[in-house]
Structures are given as C-alpha cells and as structure tokens.
Amino acid sequence: GLISNLGI
C-alpha cells in the first residue's frame, strides 16, 4: 500500500 511504499 501507499504507507508501505513511503517506508512509514
């Protein structure tokens, strides 16, 4: 997901 892609 987006969160994972941001590394957060």
Swiss-Prot record:
Coarse class of the protein's main subcellular location: secreted
Localization per record: Secreted
Top-level taxon: Eukaryota
GO CC, alphabetical: extracellular region
Organs and tissues of expression: Expressed by the skin glands.
The entry's keywords: Secreted
UniProt-recorded name of the protein: Dynastin-5
